[in-house]
């Protein structure tokens, strides 16, 4: 089966980006950083600027660096000139899944509950709504 993967060309046409990457030693996995490194040409042409961006992560254990992963990714988005759309504390669903204002984070072995789905859904909906406002 074919699993679609994002490309630099996809980043050029998309109005919003939702990055989901595992945490490794307090940062994004090297495979995601390698993809980000391919975006230099699109970035140099301004193709990543003024786009809505949000991020989610996972780690093997609680306190495994999830928040630092999200924050350091947002530094990259700031270099791009993207507009960060974190979930903040804008929905009660977030408090039922850890209350991370930077983006949803999942711990390995934790159940994929309705609360988790609601938290991810809220962050995704917020990103899409903000992207729509930016492109209106």
Regions found by a protein language model. Give the residues of each.
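Glycine-rich phosphate/pyrophosphate-binding loop and the adjoining helix
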Residues: 2, 86-136
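Helix-loop-strand module that forms the ligand-binding subsite of alpha/beta enzymes
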Residues: 3-91, 95
């Amino acid at each position: 089966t074919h699993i679609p993967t994002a490309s630099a060309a996809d980043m050029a046409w998309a109005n919003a980006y939702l990055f989901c990457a595992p945490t490794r030693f307090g940062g994004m996995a090297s495979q995601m950083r390698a993809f980000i490194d391919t975006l230099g040409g699109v970035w140099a042409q301004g193709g990543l600027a003024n786009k809505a961006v949000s991020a989610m992560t996972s780690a093997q254990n609680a306190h495994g660096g999830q928040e630092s992963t999200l924050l350091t990714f947002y530094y990259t988005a700031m270099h791009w000139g993207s507009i960060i759309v974190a979930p903040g504390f804008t929905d009660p669903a977030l408090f039922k899944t850890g209350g991370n204002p930077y983006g949803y984070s999942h711990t390995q072995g934790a159940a994929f509950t309705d609360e988790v789905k609601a938290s991810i859904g809220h962050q995704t909906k917020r990103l899409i709504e903000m992207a729509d406002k930016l492109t209106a």
